[in-house]
Amino acid sequence: MNEFDRNWISYTKDLKHPQNEAKIITAIKRSRRIVFIAKGRVGLATKMFMQRLSQMGYHVAHSEDLLIPEMGSQDIAIFVTASGSTTSSLAYIEIAKRCKCKTLAITFNAKGEISRQCEQIAEYPEPKEKGLMKSYHEVGFVYIFERIISFLPTEQFVHTNFE
């Protein structure tokens, strides 16, 4: 087993957080629409999660989409941020508040500005090892999101590949 494997086996134990998972799952299930705000490599991991949710029948959008549905009090804006203070995401908090949209931060840093402004926070422990790219954040989010998917009902799952 190499160093990467040892680090990840150890780290995934830290990412199992039933209270956070319940909070995120409840927010997803209770929302009419879900808009995700996430940037960079974390944004890529989030888009993978969005695809899974879409295949399960949830109505999802990303802040970078050209057509974001009108948001309201039955919807949620989920901010996925490793730092908790991604500058380009901060403006979306004000938009969500104006729409009376619920807000949730999924982060490794609950002390960041985004976390302070969101109604709910799901904080996870920062990876101890930094790896080649100086961060394992996006891989941590992939693991977190896959755990969440594993707890959601699959009755409405639709496989969208055409092969």
Please identify what each model-predicted range represents:
Residues 33-144, 148-149:
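Glycine-rich phosphate-binding loops that contact phosphosugars or nucleotide phosphates
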Residues 1-15:
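Generic N-terminal amphipathic, Lys/Arg-enriched alpha-helix
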Residues 15-19, 35, 155:
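Short secondary-structure junctions and interdomain/linker hinges
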Residues 6, 19-23, 87:
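Generic alpha-helical secondary structure signal
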